């Protein structure tokens, strides 16, 4: 292969690599978009204090995170390969930008949901404390001489 010219085989390989990277970036963006929708629905469930719906959303969230991690494992080496080839970087810049934007939205929504959950847990703890017997209250038996043994013999 001549240094100035790239063989047809090399061009085909680079094109295939770029297409695969583009497909992976699009898939990753779609997974994050789905994740964002789940987080937004989860926020509504948290605000409505619907524990069952929150649980279902957590299960969906875990499945989507598994998908995101799976795609990321394939995406990282493909990006490295494309950077080594130094071709098509400009073509994929918009996809990377879109992916970054959706990731930032996901992180922000996730943090918002965490704050809501922390507030609800705090409220629940306060409610539990209110249900518990108040400290300092005295039993009706305290301070009086009352029997501690009962004679059951006849």
From Swiss-Prot:
This protein's superkingdom?
Bacteria
Q: Name one GO biological process term.
A: bacterial-type flagellum assembly
Q: Which SUPFAM superfamilies match?
A: FlgN-like
Coiled coil segments of this chain: 8-48, 89-138
Q: Which InterPro entries match?
A: FlgN-like_sf (IPR036679)
The alphabetical list of record keywords is:
Coiled coil
Protein name as it appears in the record? Uncharacterized protein TP_0942
Species of origin reads: Treponema pallidum (strain Nichols)
